[in-house]
Curated annotation (Swiss-Prot):
Low complexity biased stretches: 239-250
InterPro entries, alphabetized: Ribosomal_uS2 (IPR001865), Ribosomal_uS2_bac/mit/plastid (IPR005706), Ribosomal_uS2_CS (IPR018130), Ribosomal_uS2_flav_dom_sf (IPR023591)
Keyword Transcription regulation: no
Domain of life: Bacteria
Protein name: Small ribosomal subunit protein uS2
Organism, scientific name: Zymomonas mobilis subsp. mobilis (strain ATCC 31821 / ZM4 / CP4)
PANTHER family, per the entry: 30S RIBOSOMAL PROTEIN S2 PROKARYOTIC AND ORGANELLAR, SMALL RIBOSOMAL SUBUNIT PROTEIN US2M
Biological processes annotated in GO: translation
Length: 250
């Protein structure tokens, strides 16, 4: 299955090669650093290209077999691209704040998601039985839950892959994924540790254009995997559902 094409030029165009100031580096990233320029580490994009391609292939293959991807990026410049990419590819996201136990205590989180859906149902129906104060309280509770859990409300269970922008900021999410054996694909800047990352992608994790580029590529890989999954399901169903198979191929 073809995956999105990542090139050295496309990475250079979005500034993926710029790391952090040399004094802020994590020595564990030394193998992925090309050198430094004016006190700034330069990432070795000759490694980034094949590593990124490998990660995209893994995501496509996993989704093609029915797997789910959880996009995680709570820093300001990642919030919108993370949500957009996940929604566009039919996947899931956390872009506000990682709640402790979001994966390792999934049963409790599932209860909170049920509460969110219950509140939405109440507020979208007849609210004549509630006072204005009660409606305001319910609305605030719903909005708070939506902010934290809206991106995973339909995930149903823990994901098969986690994609992370900024491994330092999302350290807790990565720890939970590691505990549960969920492979982590992560953008690794020069100031982070690659420990616990199954699919490292050494690159700038701060530049807005770069972050959107990574998210778009991951989304495209997931979308291609989903298309293959739908196509294969259609073929398995046989001639009786030929129109569905044709629709999946469209």
């Amino acid at each position: 299955m073809a995956v999105p094409t990542v090139t050295m030029q496309s990475l250079l165009d979005v500034g993926a090669h710029f790391g952090h100031q040399t004094h802020r580096w994590n020595p564990k990233m030394k193998p992925y650093i090309f050198g430094d320029r004016n006190g700034i580490h330069i990432m070795d994009l000759s490694q980034t290209v094949p590593l990124f391609t490998r990660a995209l292939d893994f995501i496509s293959q996993t989704v093609a077999h029915g797997g789910k991807v959880l996009f995680v990026g709570t820093k300001r410049q990642a919030q919108e691209p993370i949500a957009d990419a996940a929604r566009r590819s039919g996947q899931f996201f956390v872009n506000h704040r990682w709640l402790g136990g979001m994966l390792t205590n999934w049963r409790t989180i599932s209860g909170s998601i049920k509460r969110l859906k219950s509140l939405e149902e109440k507020l979208s129906g007849d609210t004549a039985g509630f006072t204005k104060k009660e409606i305001l309280q319910l609305t605030r509770e719903r909005d708070k839950l939506e902010l934290s859990l809206g991106g995973i409300r339909d995930m149903g269970t823990i994901p098969d892959i986690m994609f992370v922008v900024d491994a330092n900021k999302e350290e807790l999410a990565i720890k939970e994924a590691n505990t549960l054996g969920i492979p982590v694909v992560a953008i690794l800047d020069s100031n982070v540790s690659p420990d616990g990352i199954a699919f490292p992608i050494p690159a700038n994790d701060d530049a807005a254009r770069a972050v959107r580029y990574y998210c778009d590529a991951i989304a495209e890989a997931a979308t291609r995997g989903d298309q293959q999954n739908r196509q294969e399901l259609g073929e398995d169903l046989g001639a009786a559902v030929e129109p569905a198979a044709e629709e999946a191929l469209a």
